Amino acid sequence: MRENTVISLHKFFWAAYVLALIVGSLVPVAISGAPEQSDKVVHFLAYALMAFFWPSSWRRSWLSEFCLAGGLGLLLEFGQGVLPTGRFLDPWDALANAVGAGVGAVAAFAWSRSARRNLFKSLRRKA
């Protein structure tokens, strides 16, 4: 498998993840039996993963990645408060989104580009 194909698959799966995140943020979900405020952990992890796996060809700096991922989280939280989706705006969810985006962006940059290239090379060899 060529490196361009691997990168294209990465972008495709990342875009599918973001689309699922958007839909999941706007569609009402009833979760019973979960501890109170446990959704903050889910928000944090969802946005950390989105920022961490941000396609490197679109990445300019950890700050721009944080602003875009965190901005999407804020926009979706605002949308929950404005749109008639049965969801409501929660500032703590917005904070968890932003913190997760920041941690994911910084973690992605801490993990060097060469490490990412080595991962793609190993994936390409296996394919």
Residue positions per predicted region:
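Bulky hydrophobic segments
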Residues: 1-94, 98, 102-127
